[in-house]
């Protein structure tokens, strides 16, 4: 399995960190007043948020991030997959975190912009969890090669 959050695993399972990635907070034209300045999470918590459903590991990560700063994360819109967040932000339904690579093209096209947050969001990892008692599939090995070849 490939996950984006460190988990506790017991033998015969093992974890292997494959790649780091960063998430960025993005907004659409409706929130242009947020562009070009550092903004606290407390101030940002007053804006409409778009995130994943509460069961998602990324959502739990964001819940903890907000809690670590004395805030509760209460998104106004919950979506099933990360790739749905970007179009929702582009259509000005709120602000949201996405992996940096997801936002690159839309930022270049100026459909969305990055919002600089005072409280730094920790770097995340793509992690492979595998069973040492079974051989890894060809697909798993190829995906690992692909991730290793990508820039950090």
Where does each model-flagged region fall?
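Alpha-helix capping/helix-boundary segments
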Residues: 8-9, 31, 58, 84, ...
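Secondary-structure junction motif
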Residues: 33-35, 48-69, 136-140, 144
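Hydrophobic hinge/microswitch elements
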Residues: 61-115
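A late-sequence structural motif
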Residues: 2, 115-152
């Amino acid at each position: 399995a490939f996950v984006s959050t460190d988990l506790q695993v017991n033998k015969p399972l093992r974890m292997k960190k494959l790649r780091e990635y960063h998430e960025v907070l993005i907004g659409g034209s409706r929130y242009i007043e947020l562009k070009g300045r550092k903004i606290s999470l407390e101030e940002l918590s007053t804006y409409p948020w778009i995130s994943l459903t509460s069961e998602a590991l990324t959502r739990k990560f964001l819940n903890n991030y907000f809690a670590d700063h004395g805030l509760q994360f209460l998104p106004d819109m919950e979506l099933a997959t990360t790739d749905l967040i970007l179009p929702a932000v582009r259509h000005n339904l709120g602000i949201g975190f996405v992996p940096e690579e997801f936002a690159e093209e839309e930022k270049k096209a100026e459909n969305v912009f990055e919002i600089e947050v005072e409280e730094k969001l920790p770097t995340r990892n793509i992690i492979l969890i595998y069973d040492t008692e079974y051989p890894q599939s060809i697909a798993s090995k190829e995906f690992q090669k692909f991730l290793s070849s990508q820039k950090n």
